[in-house]
């Protein structure tokens, strides 16, 4: 009897130790889990939520997260120059992670800028902010903003981070407008006519994004300023561009809605600017104002000497007077027939890539496509600078289906096969490398300094990026399902013709007025003005030898896919 009792007692003692260890293990596991959860909560609170980023919950799921790669191996082409360095996963949201450092930095910059700029007033009752005293211009009042019948429509631009009253006034005055209007805290509208309907002052209650305490309109409301003093001083620096000599249409008075006799070129340009027309047409001493049309499209300029008589007042001009020649000038007025854009009304199930190597003109082509189609373009990345300048599709997830096409610099089989069709934009690698290095050092509109060009950074940049230019094109030629190849240089030479090809590829109906408007405003707001100050030749002979080898290989690959080869200017001399 005693033996079974001691056996039971021994078992219970062992069971106690066993339960004790189980309890300790359970508590330790629970503590670790609690600490991990607390860490994630703190991490999310510091970075913002998916909702703050404008992404759906699905957009951060496995089905949308792909590990990005620098272009894969470039066979037989200086493999040692390829970007094959692996980057470890750092502590940040998954959608920020990419193996290409440039793209990762781009996403990280957008992420931090966007989180920083979240409006703390969202969800709180609106309050009236007092108008600050403004030295430039005179505040007129709060007016109703009707998007369909907008009065201040001559020039429209956005700045969702840094819009101020002075910024809008200066921009409108520079273009010689009389009135500047601000809405939604970030939108600026210019024009020469005051809106018709006034609104209550308290309805203009949106604080300017870049200036605390000042008012920049409201929802469908404009804070309007008169720029009379600035307008007078701006006339001295009026930005009028000579477009060329053209043959005037036969029914000139019917095509151009406004005309005035006996005006000089300067007077005609000022007259048409005041009437808010983008073109001033001078035929002898007659002045006409209007837009490019199908009958007068500015596609075929004539020899300058044919219009010289008008300007010089020579005897020859008497003979020319009987001919239908005219001189055309671009006024500061923006052609607004193609500035309205929107998201696709029905989500598309077809994903079309607008693919290019960085520096190949992707942003410029997006500007052309958006204004020609009227629909926003999307992006595989999130560039806050572009979003703040009006590329509203930049914020949408690339698979939202609401944009006409999606910008990408990615390559590799997996990344390319995610798209149903693609527009491959190719630019001369010498020009593309310089453009991307300028963007990297000076931003979208700036230039690298001479110090940058002579530093070690430039050779390292060429060593890495030159091979990427080649492998990017080769990968898309190999894995792209349905491909349209567009050369940047061809687009510059034949803008309308190449735009028609792209619109047909995108299956978008062609609107002739929008195309004429695009041609009239083809540069947009992302063209680098002037030229780089550096006169140095940035490419060494060794660099040229490597790049020329890449050019020959891409040219051969294009012809193998039955595309025309690279333009002659690419080819090594």
UniProtKB/Swiss-Prot annotation:
<keyword id="KW-0735">Signal-anchor</keyword>
<dbReference type="InterPro" id="IPR002889">
    <property type="entry name" value="WSC_carb-bd"/>
</dbReference>
<feature type="domain" description="WSC 1">
    <location>
        <begin position="136"/>
        <end position="228"/>
    </location>
</feature>
<feature type="glycosylation site" description="N-linked (GlcNAc...) asparagine">
    <location>
        <position position="312"/>
    </location>
</feature>
<keyword id="KW-0812">Transmembrane</keyword>
<feature type="topological domain" description="Cytoplasmic">
    <location>
        <begin position="1"/>
        <end position="14"/>
    </location>
</feature>
<feature type="topological domain" description="Extracellular">
    <location>
        <begin position="36"/>
        <end position="573"/>
    </location>
</feature>
<dbReference type="Pfam" id="PF01822">
    <property type="entry name" value="WSC"/>
</dbReference>
<dbReference type="GO" id="GO:0008146">
    <property type="term" value="F:sulfotransferase activity"/>
</dbReference>
<feature type="glycosylation site" description="N-linked (GlcNAc...) asparagine">
    <location>
        <position position="262"/>
    </location>
</feature>
<comment type="function">
    <text>Sialate:O-sulfotransferase which catalyzes 8-O-sulfation at the Sia-glycan level using 3'-phosphoadenosine 5'-phosphosulfate (PAPS) as a donor, forming 8-O-sulfated Sia (Sia8S)-glycans.</text>
</comment>
<keyword id="KW-0333">Golgi apparatus</keyword>
<dbReference type="InterPro" id="IPR027417">
    <property type="entry name" value="P-loop_NTPase"/>
</dbReference>
<feature type="domain" description="WSC 2">
    <location>
        <begin position="239"/>
        <end position="332"/>
    </location>
</feature>
<keyword id="KW-0677">Repeat</keyword>
<dbReference type="GO" id="GO:0000139">
    <property type="term" value="C:Golgi membrane"/>
</dbReference>
<dbReference type="Pfam" id="PF00685">
    <property type="entry name" value="Sulfotransfer_1"/>
</dbReference>
<feature type="transmembrane region" description="Helical; Signal-anchor for type II membrane protein">
    <location>
        <begin position="15"/>
        <end position="35"/>
    </location>
</feature>
<protein>
    <recommendedName>
        <fullName>Sialate:O-sulfotransferase 1</fullName>
    </recommendedName>
</protein>
<dbReference type="InterPro" id="IPR051589">
    <property type="entry name" value="Sialate-O-sulfotransferase"/>
</dbReference>
<feature type="glycosylation site" description="N-linked (GlcNAc...) asparagine">
    <location>
        <position position="239"/>
    </location>
</feature>
<keyword id="KW-0325">Glycoprotein</keyword>
<comment type="similarity">
    <text>Belongs to the WSCD family.</text>
</comment>
<feature type="glycosylation site" description="N-linked (GlcNAc...) asparagine">
    <location>
        <position position="562"/>
    </location>
</feature>
<feature type="glycosylation site" description="N-linked (GlcNAc...) asparagine">
    <location>
        <position position="251"/>
    </location>
</feature>
<feature type="glycosylation site" description="N-linked (GlcNAc...) asparagine">
    <location>
        <position position="315"/>
    </location>
</feature>
<keyword id="KW-1133">Transmembrane helix</keyword>
<dbReference type="InterPro" id="IPR000863">
    <property type="entry name" value="Sulfotransferase_dom"/>
</dbReference>
<keyword id="KW-0472">Membrane</keyword>
């Amino acid at each position: 009897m005693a033996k079974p009792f001691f056996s039971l007692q021994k078992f219970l003692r062992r069971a106690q130790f066993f339960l004790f260890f189980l309890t300790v293990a359970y508590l330790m596991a629970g503590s670790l889990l609690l600490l991990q959860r607390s860490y994630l909560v703190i991490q999310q609170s510091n970075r913002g939520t998916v909702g703050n980023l404008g992404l759906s919950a699905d957009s951060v799921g496995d089905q949308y997260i792909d590990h990005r790669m620098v272009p894969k191996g470039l066979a037989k082409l200086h493999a040692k120059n390829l970007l094959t360095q692996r980057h470890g996963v750092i502590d940040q949201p998954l959608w920020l992670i990419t193996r290409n450092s440039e793209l990762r930095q781009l996403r990280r910059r957008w992420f931090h800028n966007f989180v920083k700029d979240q409006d703390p007033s969202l969800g709180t009752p609106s309050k009236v902010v007092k108008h600050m005293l403004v030295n430039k211009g005179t505040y007129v009042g709060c007016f109703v903003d009707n998007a369909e019948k907008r009065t201040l429509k001559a020039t429209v631009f956005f700045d969702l981070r840094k819009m101020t009253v002075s910024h809008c006034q200066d921009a409108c005055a520079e273009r010689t407008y009389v009135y500047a209007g601000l809405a939604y805290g970030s939108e600026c509208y210019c024009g020469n006519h005051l809106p018709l309907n006034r609104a209550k002052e308290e309805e203009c209650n949106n604080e300017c994004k870049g200036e605390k305490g000042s008012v920049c309109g409201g929802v469908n409301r404009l804070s309007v300023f008169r720029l009379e003093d600035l307008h007078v001083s701006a006339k001295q620096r009026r930005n009028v561009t000579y477009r060329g000599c053209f043959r005037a249409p036969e029914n000139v008075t019917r095509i151009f809605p406004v005309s005035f006799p006996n005006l000089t070129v300067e007077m005609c340009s000022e007259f048409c600017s005041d009437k808010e027309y983008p073109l001033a047409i001078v035929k002898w001493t007659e002045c006409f104002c209007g837009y490019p049309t199908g009958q007068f499209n500015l596609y075929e300029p004539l020899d300058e000497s044919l219009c010289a008589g008008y300007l010089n007042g020579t005897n020859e001009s008497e003979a020319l007077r009987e001919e239908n020649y005219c001189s055309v000038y671009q006024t500061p007025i923006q052609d607004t027939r193609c500035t309205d854009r929107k998201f696709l009304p029905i989500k598309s199930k077809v994903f079309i890539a607008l693919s290019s190597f960085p520096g190949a003109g992707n942003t410029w082509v997006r500007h052309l496509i958006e204004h020609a189609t009227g629909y926003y373009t999307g992006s595989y990345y999130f560039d806050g600078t572009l979003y703040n300048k009006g590329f509203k599709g930049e914020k949408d997830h690339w698979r939202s289906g609401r944009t006409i096409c999606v910008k990408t610099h990615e390559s590799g089989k997996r990344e390319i096969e995610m798209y149903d069709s693609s527009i491959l934009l190719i630019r001369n690698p010498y020009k593309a490398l310089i453009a991307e290095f300028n963007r990297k050092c000076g931003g979208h509109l700036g230039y690298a300094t001479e110090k940058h060009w002579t530093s070690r950074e430039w050779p390292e940049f060429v060593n890495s990026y030159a091979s990427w230019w080649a492998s990017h094109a080769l990968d898309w030629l190999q894995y792209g399902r349905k491909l349209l190849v567009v050369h940047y240089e061809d687009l510059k030479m034949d803008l309308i013709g190449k735009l028609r090809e792209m619109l047909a590829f995108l299956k978008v109906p062609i609107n002739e007025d929008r195309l004429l408007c695009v041609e009239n405003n083809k540069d947009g707001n992302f063209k680098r003005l002037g030229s780089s100050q550096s006169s140095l030749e940035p490419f060494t002979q060794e660099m040229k030898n490597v790049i020329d080898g890449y050019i020959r290989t891409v040219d051969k690959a294009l012809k193998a896919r039955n595309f025309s080869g690279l333009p002659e200017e690419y080819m090594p001399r």
